[in-house]
Design a protein with these regions (language model features):
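The feature marks proteins involved in alpha-glucan
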Residues: 1-52, 57-65, 74
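Substrate-binding/active-site clefts of carbohydrate-active enzymes
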Residues: 38-45, 54-205
Length: 205
């Protein structure tokens, strides 16, 4: 079975599984004021109120139960209004990396370096971050380095062997979720995950 690129920044819309070529090096950022203020912000002294939200279920377009997702851009406008009305300072977005199964809420990731294409392109994702930052709203990402699904196009048995996961199923299988568990004893796996955390901060602010 063909594997998706573990470092791809964009993926086909499910049920497609292929990686797509895109360039995220030239994303247009307009949140310089926010970024400057964030450097001086003291989270130990400043008030902080976090609203956790799953984009796919928070709000949908009427009459479209199965799909009807708001795009990154639509969501940014809607959530900003709500956040300002309610007095929240930060939004924590659940499970935003690419994942094949809607029901996992983004917690069974196949594309660790790609914002999910359910809601738009990487450019649209950056637009959302820009919009929220310009409106004074901080963005927290729910990062999911614990386990990953067995989908054939994903990380499981990537080269035919236990590449990212433990080879011993007693360690490498998550009994509750039926997923694979990262082998953090491997330098390559630790590097993959640490680089991934840095990637989101550096590329998407």
């Amino acid at each position: 079975h063909m594997k998706a690129d573990p470092y791809a920044n964009y993926a086909e819309l499910r049920p497609g599984t292929a990686s797509r070529i895109t360039n995220i090096e030239n994303l247009k950022w307009t949140d310089s004021s926010w970024m400057t203020a964030r450097e001086k912000w003291n989270h130990k002294k400043e008030p902080m109120s976090v609203y956790e939200v799953h984009m796919g279920s928070w709000k949908r377009h009427p009459g479209t139960e199965d799909e009807g997702f708001y795009t990154y851009r639509e969501f940014a406008k809607e959530i900003t209004k709500y956040m300002k009305d309610m007095g929240y300072t930060h939004v924590e977005i659940m499970g935003i990396a690419e994942h094949p199964f809607d029901g996992s809420w983004g917690y069974q990731v196949t594309g660790y370096y790609a914002p999910t294409s359910r809601y738009g392109t990487p450019e649209d994702f950056a637009w959302m971050i820009n919009y929220l930052h310009r409106n004074g709203i901080g963005v927290i990402m729910d990062w999911v380095p614990a386990h990953f699904p067995k989908d054939e196009h994903g990380l499981a048995e990537f080269d035919g062997t236990a590449t990212y996961e433990y080879a011993d199923p007693r360690k490498g299988e998550h009994p509750d979720w039926g997923t694979k568990i990262f082998d953090l004893g491997k330098n390559e796996v630790r590097n993959f995950l640490i680089a991934n955390a840095l990637f989101w901060v550096e590329h998407f602010h």
